[in-house]
Amino acid sequence: MTIIDQLNTALSGIVLHLPYLLTILGWTWALHVVNVFFGYRLCMFGIIPRFPTGLVGIFIAPFLHGNFNHIFMNSFFFLGLGSFVILQGEQVFNVVSIAIIVIAGLLTWLFARRAAHVGASSVIMGYWSFLMVRAYYHPDIIDLLAAALGLYYFGVHMAASLVSHEKGVSVEGHVFGFLAGAVTGAFYPAIAMWVLAGADKLGLYLGG
């Protein structure tokens, strides 16, 4: 298969899976509208480090955002990097997303400063590092292109976010998300077995 053929296949795959990503994004925006209606009080359900109830926020925090700029920027990056991750298949996308959410969320709960941590930035950072690790282990043209484009278009913003001191920005979430994505990429087979086994026990279907 030529490079052009691979690129055409990738583009077709992105278009095919775009409705799935837009559905996730749609529910995230719907939740944000509800959050705005309640004066952003839903953010209290984010990850609150070292509070037992804050553990629930691990699965809720990625869908909560502190303002419209926050959710708008994350929506853009989610579609960009998520499109490359989902090229591996919806099951891989779901496994990677869950692994990043759980690993980054637990690390944030254990080690982050005491505050309500919300936003999809940790997941997006995880997608970026996952793609880079995958490109290292499986250097085909699509994975290399995904990592390169992620680095070029998103790298400056995300690298800056790692050391950001902006109020309301969860620096720890960015760092732990990046680490979670790298770990998921490096140990994907083992992590996939763990995630799929857990999903099976809960009766969840993550795609074939």
Q: Which functions belong to the PLM regions below?
A:
Residues 2-208:
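A detector for small-residue-rich transmembrane helices and their helix-helix packing motifs
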